[in-house]
Structure formats: C-alpha cells, structure tokens
C-alpha cells in the first residue's frame, strides 16, 4: 500500500508541473491568460524573460518565458517570483 501511495504522489506531482501552469490564449484573443500557477520553483537559468498577464484575464500572473520559449505561469506574490523579476530587470 505504501508503494502505491508513493507512486500516486509522484504522478500527481508530475501532473502539477505540466500544462495547467502554462499560459494559454483566452478564446480567440492572443493575450495569454493563466488558470493555474506553477507549484514548484522554476530554475532561474531556464528563464530568459517575463511579462504580466493582461487585466482582461481572470487571474493576475507573471508569465516566465524559458530558454525553449515555453510560457510558464507563476504567482506574482511568491518571493521567488519577485526575486526572478528583480534579477531579470537588473540583467
């Protein structure tokens, strides 16, 4: 039973790092909106730039763009997100 609980935990953690935290266009509009935040800290070396979601989106978020051009949503209230923004601004 402990093994299946551990496997389930790993699967759920992996799933939380996937698509729900990605920025997606809102309908036919090309403005990305976020519906969930990344639950883990993104390695800073992977981040090349960032932008904020539009006020038209229901959730305010920071969208980090990775070196592979993947857009990842992050909670702007998290300390690590604010530190990454400061780092990118000073870069």
Curated annotation (Swiss-Prot):
Pfam families: IL8. The keyword Signal applies. Disulfide bonds join 33-57, 34-73. Belongs to the intercrine beta (chemokine CC) family. GO terms for cellular component: extracellular space. Keywords: Chemotaxis, Cytokine, Disulfide bond, Inflammatory response, Secreted, Signal. One of its GO terms (molecular function) is chemokine activity. Residues 1-23 form the signal peptide. SMART domains: SCY (SM00199). Chemoattractant for blood monocytes, memory T-helper cells and eosinophils. Causes the release of histamine from basophils and activates eosinophils. May activate several chemokine receptors including CCR1, CCR3, CCR4 and CCR5. May also be an agonist of the G protein-coupled receptor GPR75. Together with GPR75, may play a role in neuron survival through activation of a downstream signaling pathway involving the PI3, Akt and MAP kinases. By activating GPR75 may also play a role in insulin secretion by islet cells. Its main location: secreted. The keyword Chaperone does not apply. This is C-C motif chemokine 5. One of its GO terms (biological process) is chemokine-mediated signaling pathway. PANTHER family: C-C MOTIF CHEMOKINE 5 (PTHR12015:SF170), SMALL INDUCIBLE CYTOKINE A (PTHR12015). It is found in: Secreted. InterPro entries: Chemokine_b/g/d, Chemokine_CC_CS, Chemokine_IL8-like_dom, Interleukin_8-like_sf.
